[in-house]
Curated annotation (Swiss-Prot):
GO CC field: ribonucleoprotein complex; ribosome
Record protein name field: Large ribosomal subunit protein uL23
InterPro entries membership: Nucleotide-bd_a/b_plait_sf (IPR012677), Ribosomal_uL23-like (IPR013025), Ribosomal_uL23/eL15/eS24_sf (IPR012678)
Molecular function terms, GO-annotated: rRNA binding; structural constituent of ribosome
Superkingdom of source: Bacteria
Amino acid sequence: MKSPYDIILKPIISEDSMEKMEDKKYVFKVDKNANKIEIRNAIEKIFDVKVKSVNTMNVKGKVKRMGAHSGKRSDWKKAIVALTEDSKEIEFFEGM
């Protein structure tokens, strides 16, 4: 079994994710092979909160060019985690 810290890679800080925080929704970059149940358990264990729902999406890597050479960034998975109403906020995102 994977460690929760291997499943949740990093938070995604963007204008859209900051607006979702008002509704107790947080956006994370997660392991590409993780499923919703693993993501839910990892968030609950790391941040000591109750998760209401988890939405995941696979993000395709962009094609980037460097002069005549072209390459592709890696594909990755994004998870939007909604917390229950009585759950505390994730402190990591406060003050952003």
